[in-house]
Every structure is written in C-alpha cells, then in structure tokens.
C-alpha cells in the first residue's frame, strides 16, 4: 500500500488500486511509463528505473497494445537488470497522431491524460481550424483543453487573436516561453497528480515550454 501511495504524485488513484486488485497479479509492482525509447523504456516506481518489454509484449503485432508514455503497467523487478513490463493496465484515454503517408494509421503518443495545452504561435502558425481539430480529438477522450498563445512578443494586437477564440469558451494563456512569460499560469492549470501534454505543430514552442516547466532553462 505504501508503494502505491508514493505513486499518487504520478497519478495513481483509488480506481487504479481497484483495477490492480482485480487483476490479482503476483510478484509484480505497478509503475508508470515516463519515457519511451522504442526498445527500452523508463518507468516510475516511484523512483525512475529502466525497463524493457516481456517477450510476449515485444511480439505484439498491434503496436497500440505495447506500453506508451503515460501507461500504467505491471512490472517484474530483477536484481541488477532492467525491470520487465509484463502487462499494460486498461487505458482511460489516449492521444494519437496520424502516421505520415497513411490515411487511417495512427500512432499513440500518450495515454491517461488529464489536461492538454494546445499551443498556437502568434506568428505564421495561428490556425483556428487546426485548433478545432485538436479540440475535437480531446473532447472524444474527455481531456480538459487549455489554449496557449505563444510568442506573444511577435504581435502588438493580441486581442485580434483572442477574439477569434471566444467561441470556444476555454481558458487562454498568453505566453512568451523564451522569456518565461506564462509558464506559471500553465502550471496553475495542472492539479496535483494530473497528467498534462503539450500539443501543437512543429516550431510553436513545445520544447521550450517543456524545458521551462522542468527548470532546464
């Protein structure tokens, strides 16, 4: 029980405890996937450990069934070796992107997400239609959206952009990530134990905001 209590900051809930108990797994620990490098992963136990897939999971033909960032998994701990992921717990939701060149194929990029920050840059990237597509996907999966207008230093008429977003009736964060502006407001939209994701096209500032949130810049 104590180990599971330590996982609450990573999003472990009483509902997950009930799922875990119902599975009746023996000699395994719950963990959350926090990084995916393809052949290897990192998991929170809550301490961060290296992990790899069991032979069964590694041979799944449907790649959506293998662990993704945000998944809760059952792991077997080994001495002086990476933990072995034996099972993926049922997902509450997932976020996927289309695979380039394939009309119907999708690639899951994150699982069990609570809040999504949809980034639009106030330069050449601003697109209400792209935002609308993101919001549709989030609504299907019951993920709470927050709009982030980044690169606010690139315009003197922010209201011209915010007026176009009034129809959505969603929180809007005005940010200039390179200067650290708006980062604290983003943090305020994330409750303890919640999982957040940054969405947006290339170049809108996802990496910069991530680094600011992690204190790397």
What are the functions of these language-model segments?
Residues 62-63, 134, 186:
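Short beta-alpha junctions and helix-cap segments that line functional grooves
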Residues 38, 75-78, 90-94, 140-143, ...:
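Non-catalytic alpha-helical coupling and interface elements of nucleotide-dependent molecular machines
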